[in-house]
Amino acid sequence: MKYLGTQTLETKRLILRKIKLNDYKDAFKNWCNSENVDKYVIWTKHPTEEETKILYTKWIEEYDEKTYRWIIELKDINEVIGTIDVSKRFLNFGTCEIGYCLSDKYWNQGIMTEATNEVIRFLFEECDADTICAQFLENNPASGKVMEKVGMKYEGRLRSRIFDKDNNRNDLLVYSILKEEYFNNKK
């Protein structure tokens, strides 16, 4: 795998780019403090803008050639509405595990599918990844629909794998797409 780091990517409606510190205000307003988003993520919503600012400062400092972390900016309004990133956990094996988060104001508009498609294209075509995978809590089937729309296939269920905010164990559902599947789907 070629390590190119977070490059600016563009789609019809979106700009995917590195996080800038001043993004924290939109992030806090649009998803980091959202009750609706909080239902479907494993982290706890941020009580203050300062918490989001601290996190973004840390993330900005972590950027290197093996960091793939994009802010999702909606072109029409020049506002950040979400994030999409790659865990470093399996990068040395050519496997990219992606995760994403989107403001609930933009759910069900195809935005996350558009962003994920572009990141998958970048990882396979420019970084030469072998496999791209993703996981989601079973209470978030919309995330699984995004994975299916971008060509990922259901791999299985990681039973009782993670605790939710109420300290209950939850299953994670796993999807992936292989390099050869991606290129075959493009034909």
PLM features: residue spans?
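Acyl-donor (CoA/ACP) binding surface of acyl/acetyltransferases
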Residues: M1-D26, N30-N36, E73-K187
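Short, conserved alpha-helical segments within structured domains
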Residues: T44-T48, Y68, N139
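A short hydrophobic/aromatic micro-motif that marks alpha-helical segments and, especially, helix-coil
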Residues: T48-E50, Y63, D166
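Hydrophobic residues in alpha-helical segments
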Residues: W31-C32, V41, I60-Y63
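Conserved GNAT-fold acetyl-CoA-binding loop/helix
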Residues: N36-K58
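A short helix-loop-beta-strand connector motif used in the catalytic cores of GNAT acetyltransferases and
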Residues: T57-I71
